[in-house]
Amino acid sequence: MNRGMTLIELLVALALSIILSLGLYYSFRYSGIFFSQDKAISDLIEYARTAEEQLKFYFDRWGNGVPEGGTDCTYSFPNGYPKNRFCIIKGSSGNCDEIIFYGNTQGFLIVLDEKDEDEFNALACRMTNDEDDYYYIWKEDKPVDTTTGNRIGVSGGDCGIKGIIPNASVAKEINTLDKGTVTLQTGDAIIRVPKIIKIYCSETNGELYLKVSEQEANKAPVESPLVPVKEMEATLLPEGCDPTNGECTAVRFRITFVNRVGNEEYTLTKDIVLGR
């Protein structure tokens, strides 16, 4: 004969149901917390990787295409050359140190052999025809004049095509910024004027970011926020080096990256050493 559950059996079943429900609740709750923590830490590791990769891009170009011969580390376009092409300046602002150096991040052209009576063959990469893009004309390892993209007359120059030399041609006579002319010869170079590269921190939307700015010639700086940080310390290497004469060959950055998730703050401090 079938009969219903007794009161005790009902209470036991209810208790087991509550225990199972609580177990599932806390399991889902804490798995969500652990997942959130893992995601926050994973993001921090990615911040550090991104920062190192981006900063390395600029340090690989430190000193490239930079004239020298001035009395200090100041560079001003067109003729205020720094004392040494590997000059580096360290400053500080708030929680972060600042690093400034000079380098070419864009176009160049190397004059090769004669193509015809009006042009030379050339190896070129990332050249432009913009009148606001400035270039130094180099002869025997020093700039002799200044020109602009629209005065050079480059044909071709796709640096994405590897193994093809020459990949461009250039006029033998180049009009300069002061309305004169320069006659090119084999071995001469036309190189985009160097940029002032600054690594620093400042706020964006109320949050402190590691940033890089590039400033070319008489143009305004172009700022690129990289990742959120709490602080950054920079040390010139080797320690005690003279930053004005090329003795400093690297910088050690100690950067504390930050990731805020709700009311929680996660940080990761990493040393990054970059140089030329």
UniProtKB/Swiss-Prot annotation:
Q: At which residues is N-methylmethionine found?
A: M5
Membrane topology term reads: Single-pass membrane protein
Keywords noted in UniProt: Membrane, Methylation, Transmembrane, Transmembrane helix
Intrachain disulfide bonds = none
User: In terms of domain of life, where is this protein from?
Assistant: Bacteria
Would the keyword Metal-binding turn up in this protein's UniProt record? no
Q: Does the keyword Transmembrane helix apply?
A: yes
Where is this protein chiefly located? membrane
Kindly state one GO CC term assigned in the UniProt record. Answer: membrane
* Pfam families with a match to the protein in the record: N_methyl
Transmembrane regions: 5-26
List localization entries. Answer: Membrane
User: Which residues are part of the propeptide segment?
Assistant: 1-4
InterPro entries reported for this sequence: N_methyl_site
Q: What's the protein name?
A: Uncharacterized protein aq_1436
